[in-house]
Amino acid sequence: MSYYKITDLENYFKMYKKSVREPRKFWDKIADENFTWYQKWDKVFEFDMQEAKFEWFQNAKLNITKNCIDRHLAKRGEKTAIIFEPNDPKEEAQHISYNELYARVAKFANVLRDQGIKKGDRVCIYLPMIPELAISILACARIGAVHSVVFAGFSSSAVAARINDCECKMVITSDGSYRGNKAIDLKGIVDEALEKCPTVEKVLVAKRTNTNVNMKAGRDQWLQPLLDDAMNTNVAEIMDAEDPLFILYTSGSTGKPKGMVHTTAGYMVYTAYTFKNVFSYEENDIFWCTADIGWITGHSYILYGPLLNGATTVIFEGVPSYPDFSRFWEVIEKHQVTQFYTAPTAIRALAKESLDYVQKFPLQSLKVIGSVGEPINEEAWHWYNDHVGGKKCPVVDTWWQTETGGIMISPLAFVTPTKPTYASLPLPGIQPVLMDEKRNEIEGNQVTGSLCIKYPWPSIARTIWGDHQRYKETYFSAFPGKYFTGDGALRDEVGYYRITGRVDDVVIVSGHNLGTAPIEDAINEHPAVAESAIVGFPHDIKGNALYGFVILKESGENRDRDNLSKEINQHISDHIGPIAKLDKIQFVSGLPKTRSGKIMRRILRKIAEGDFSNFGDITTLLNPEIVDEIKDGKI
């Protein structure tokens, strides 16, 4: 009996029990029967939750790209691996077969080696959603270089911080990128970032917008001529199961971003397994995840998960609103997409527009529709189910994180009965628990608490690059012996889970996790600002938006408030990127603080939400009178 594909609900419960009672046997069988290895493992896994140390498939040898590409060539060589759908619908889509993907990855891998990149070197990739992004990632994995993809919407200082943190030797970028009807100068952003990055020796530049850019002699080279001269075969590097595959930065609730390290074998096994089961993938399906590859969703479910299963995956360069709001539906129709995976923020934005946009396309090819990035609200769930899925496609509402590597709690299409707004049941191997404030596990159903996971799984991030102590403190100290997700959750009467939102200082805006601390740091660097505090508040489209409470220095007191608000948002945009801009800025004379100097954020959250009913005990505040002042000045 295959463990790899769950067939029905009874089979799910059977597999889930097996995965919990005999995890070594369960994962051993899945890894053994579905992947190509140079050498099998000595032990399936060993772990220490106190020290936050995890090893999976110990001493196994493999290369993930052989599993993504080479092993498919005999049977699926001419099958389309990647469909590239450009920003402009008038530009022709590209269909890249597995044979072509092999040749292009081999050439790119040879270029990297020729440029002095070796196993273990870090390479920063700052590219738009074009084929070169996927190919450069796979080329790094081919030669054992560690890829660190930075979302191409981040500012130069955010790029520099990420490059410096993991000491990248090379940057791969493009002359520019398209976003709707705008062209963006990516190379200019990289040039600015690299003024502060001493470790970068080489920059490879792909052509996308064909704009004039500065090329620094000795450092910058156009990519295409190098690829033209490279051989189209390449021997893959033999990697250890626990060798790092990539670093991906996620917002910290405190200070600098965290470089999550994912290693090779466990990540491979778990992303392949979850892709197959959550989306009920079958041969010849066309899978489209609308995320950017710069986020974990793109790594796991545009690239690695689909290719490991020999699937056809869509890479979409555009945005849902260009040239108009029918673009997603037009792409589904054009490429006969069978599984569609997007974010609630996109669903809400599209639901606001005329139904004509979606109704002019039959969307008969769709079998499964999915949601990712944040909990989906009931109204959006029903709109998505009714108008996109035609009430015949299961809605898989997936919960997971950058740190988890793959989907953790989700309905399995055609297996798990769905319930609006619920992520439902855990995947095999995942043991969620709810914890109370006294660190006790909450038993039974119809309860809420802090969501933790009490046993490791193959694709758990192994550490924060260069800072294992921070990794331990962030994820394993709040509830010793358990992984703390930072999310709150509710377990209903049948054991289904519903994510209720963050319980730390991270706000999810349009599906992006934004730590409040880095945004506050950016605001506080403005010469007119003394101090600031950021909280989230509900937003119809974005799910949450950011509300800033700002105290001005004396020098800023007489400044025009509208101009100051614009400058503050520009400051945030320059330091972090446009995604972190504030929707509302309220200038205040003080912030509610405890006697130890801690800002009482729950009060600010309530004010931002317009809920003045119960601020709880404010006698512990140093300045309780400030609460009324802030409340009265609410925007």
Which residues does each PLM region occupy?
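Conserved AMP-binding/adenylation subdomain of ANL enzymes
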Residues: M268-I286, I296-T338, K352-L355
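Conserved AMP-binding/adenylate-forming core of the ANL superfamily
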Residues: T65, I82-L138, S155-A160, M215, ...
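AMP-binding/adenylate-forming catalytic domain of the ANL superfamily
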Residues: K202-K207, I541, D574-I599, S613-K634
